[in-house]
């Protein structure tokens, strides 16, 4: 499902073959530690098992409830309260599969404490009906706790206790935590977050699957793609495992070429939030003990008109990873216009996706040939549930190997607690 292209990376396939050989033994050893669950952070490898060993009854119930919400034409709005992996991966999946506009339901995400944004959304929803999805393992995440107070209170005011709970689903710990306690007290429908799956790996669990189902995605196809990726990436031989090939090249650029930034490039608006997911995935997994590549995401060609100058001629502290989709979800043909007074008559009859792909290939040529930038290309055929699930789990295996190559625990994020403890101290004064 995934094809890697190394044509514009160093000197091409000859270079990558040498790198793969140099990493083969180390990769095999680390792969065994992952598969045998003996690696650093092994207690949080549940995302590897989930696509094939999930609770069948829970997912059946999740699909039934999400389809019921999706089929209710009277309620057009869905509000998702989540932050980090409880938001980014969810949105990445929905945006990956659906067209940007004219969706069956409008979805709004509350993932910050911006008073202006929250006020504006509350004012809108005072006049309209909506469903509420709150996602928090503990229920003590401040951003989500505050948002849940505000939006559940709004439902309560509009529809009473019974109406509020009918319009709400909580995704949380199966037994403990503040949100679990509230959900049980209020008799709110819940789905559980597995104990052994961290936030940035969790969009393939009820964390993401419920919202995806509400928006009309086929949950089973997402899980099918995930399971296929996990199976494909069990292979210990780096020559046969694209995830480990990519992990090795990333580590090589960091450790041997002193490239400390990775720029993720996409040419489709719908893929932007997948690169936001990658930003979190790699930053939280690798960024510890003074180590790690800093992930940067760019939407081209838009960002070629902002950071393009730096990428072409600036300080080369980075390499690029470009993700592309062969077949667009939809396409547009360029029409004749005002007797071609704009000078663009040579584009008449051409498809917009073709023009976009010419821009992509031209950028790759300019960056690699002229700018001497090393570029890894990741190519997929289609945007759909299965390809999203596959790529999501494929990158999860990449980051597991990448973190272990750096000799860090890829599955914790202790640094995130620093701002939280200071914030709570100040707020309680």
UniProtKB/Swiss-Prot annotation:
Record bears the keyword Cytoplasm = yes
List the SUPFAM superfamilies: SIS domain (SSF53697)
Q: Which UniProt keywords apply?
A: Cytoplasm, Gluconeogenesis, Glycolysis, Isomerase
The cellular component terms of Gene Ontology attached to this UniProt record, alphabetical and capped at eight, are: cytosol
The family this protein is said to belong to: Belongs to the GPI family.
Q: What is this protein called?
A: Glucose-6-phosphate isomerase
Q: Where is the active site?
A: 284 (proton donor), 305, 420
Q: Which GO terms describe its molecular function?
A: carbohydrate derivative binding; glucose-6-phosphate isomerase activity; monosaccharide binding
**Is Cytoplasm one of the keywords?**
yes
Q: In which pathway does it act?
A: Carbohydrate biosynthesis; gluconeogenesis; Carbohydrate degradation; glycolysis; D-glyceraldehyde 3-phosphate and glycerone phosphate from D-glucose: step 2/4
Q: Which organism is it from?
A: Malacoplasma penetrans (strain HF-2)
Which InterPro entries does this chain map to?
Answer: G6P_Isomerase (IPR001672), Phosphoglucose_isomerase_CS (IPR018189), SIS_dom_sf (IPR046348), SIS_PGI_1 (IPR035476), SIS_PGI_2 (IPR035482)
The subcellular localization recorded is:
Cytoplasm
Q: What is its EC number?
A: 5.3.1.9
Q: What does this protein do?
A: Catalyzes the reversible isomerization of glucose-6-phosphate to fructose-6-phosphate.
Q: What class of enzyme is it?
A: isomerase
Q: Which reaction does it catalyse?
A: alpha-D-glucose 6-phosphate = beta-D-fructose 6-phosphate
What GO terms describe the biological role, i.e. biological process, of this protein? gluconeogenesis; glucose 6-phosphate metabolic process; glycolytic process
**Gene of origin?**
pgi
């Amino acid at each position: 499902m995934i094809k890697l292209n190394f044509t514009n990376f160093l000197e091409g396939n000859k270079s990558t073959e040498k790198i793969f050989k140099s990493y083969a033994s180390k990769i095999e050893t680390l792969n065994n530690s992952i598969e045998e669950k003996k690696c650093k952070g092994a207690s949080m490898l549940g995302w590897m098992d989930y696509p094939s060993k999930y609770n069948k009854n829970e997912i059946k119930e999740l699909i039934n409830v999400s389809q019921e919400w999706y089929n209710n034409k009277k309620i057009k709005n869905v509000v998702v309260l989540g932050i980090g992996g409880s938001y980014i991966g969810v949105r990445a999946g929905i945006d990956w599969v659906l067209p940007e506009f004219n969706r069956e339901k409008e979805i709004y995400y509350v993932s910050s404490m911006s008073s202006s944004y929250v006020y504006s959304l509350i004012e809108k929803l005072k006049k309209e009906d909506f469903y509420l999805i709150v996602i928090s393992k503990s229920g003590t995440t401040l951003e989500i706790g505050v948002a849940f107070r505000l939006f559940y209170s709004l439902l309560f005011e509009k529809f009473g206790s019974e109406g509020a709970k009918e319009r709400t689903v909580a995704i949380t710990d199966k037994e403990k935590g503040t949100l679990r306690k509230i959900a049980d007290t209020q008799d709110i429908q819940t789905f559980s977050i597995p104990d052994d799956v961290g936030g940035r790996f969790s969009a393939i669990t009820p964390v993401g699957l419920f919202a995806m189902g509400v928006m009309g995605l086929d949950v089973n196809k997402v899980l099918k793609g995930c399971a296929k990726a996990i199976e494909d990436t069990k292979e210990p031989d780096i020559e046969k495992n694209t995830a480990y090939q990519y992990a090795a090249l990333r580590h090589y650029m960091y450790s041997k070429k002193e490239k400390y930034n990775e720029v993720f490039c996409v040419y489709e608006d719908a893929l932007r939030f997948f690169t936001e997911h990658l930003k979190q995935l790699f930053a939280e997994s690798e960024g510890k003990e003074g180590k790690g590549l800093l992930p940067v995401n760019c939407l081209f060609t838009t960002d070629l008109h902002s950071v393009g100058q730096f990428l072409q001629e600036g300080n080369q502290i980075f390499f690029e990873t470009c993700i592309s989709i062969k077949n667009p979800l939809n396409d547009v043909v360029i029409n004749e216009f005002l007797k071609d007074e704009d000078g663009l008559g040579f584009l008449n009859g051409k498809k917009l996706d073709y023009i976009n792909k010419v821009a992509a290939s031209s950028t790759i040529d300019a960056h690699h040939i002229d700018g001497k930038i090393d570029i890894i290309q990741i190519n997929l055929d289609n945007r759909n549930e299965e390809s999203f699930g596959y790529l999501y789990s494929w990158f999860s295996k990449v980051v597991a190997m990448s973190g272990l190559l750096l000799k860090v625990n890829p599955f914790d994020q202790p640094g995130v607690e620093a701002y939280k403890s200071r914030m709570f101290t100040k707020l309680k004064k």
